[in-house]
Amino acid sequence: CRIYAEDSSKNFLPSIGRLTRYIEPVGKNVRIDSGVVEGSEISMFYDPMISKLCTHSRTRTEAINEMINALDRYYIEGVKTNRDFLSNILQKTSFHSGLYSTSFISDEYPDGYNSNSVSIKNREILYCVATFVNFQYLLRAASISNQLKGFNKTVGNMWNVVDGKKNISVKINFNNFNNNYDVYLLNKHFSIKSNWKIGYPLFSAIIDNKLHYFAINRDGVRFK
């Protein structure tokens, strides 16, 4: 995959600017060729390619999954990129089958690529991640030293996640039996295990026995 500074939802319009944050994925099955670092300028005078990402594994399917995970582990701020678009392509059934042609994009995206299109299942995972991350921030705030006796802060475990005009009730508990967090929302249960630390922009967790990666951007009480 070639990671480009471009807006895939606007007919791949180049996105120029400075890479204010730039973290590349690492792994034994991952190779990256790049000529940029954090702080580099993506100029209108040159090709806006950021890097080339290669993955390998025993089978095509495994290599594709390695690629998806590697794309998820990129953290890029300052410019728009085609990272999500590439990940979306890699998850298409037609791509997995290998039966595609040079008209792949027009066939699969006749109305263009919608970067805001998120499946219901993925939205539920996002709600879980937002709940977990917010809980960690609240736990840290409640553990500040030198609190007045009798006024120690406690953290509740039931909140609302706001997604546009939607309000989703959520509940989170720490499970002492398996050191996981249990999140309940929309009459469903999710199990989360993560070693994520506050302040690190890349979030990784095993959610219902599947590894997920997310870029975390906190703005006040909002996450994106």
Label the model's feature ranges:
Residues 175-177, 199, 219:
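Structural motif
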Residues 188-212:
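A conserved acidic, glycine/proline-rich C-terminal tail/linker
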Residues 156-158, 180, 200-204, 213, ...:
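Short, acidic/polar N-cap/turn motifs at the starts of alpha helices
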Residues 2-191:
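Catalytic cores of soluble metabolic enzymes centered on carboxylation/carboxyl-transfer
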Residues 161, 183-185, 205, 216, ...:
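Short aromatic-centered micro-motifs
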Residues 152-154, 165, 196-198, 207-209, ...:
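Short solvent-exposed loop/turn micro-motifs enriched in small/polar/acidic residues
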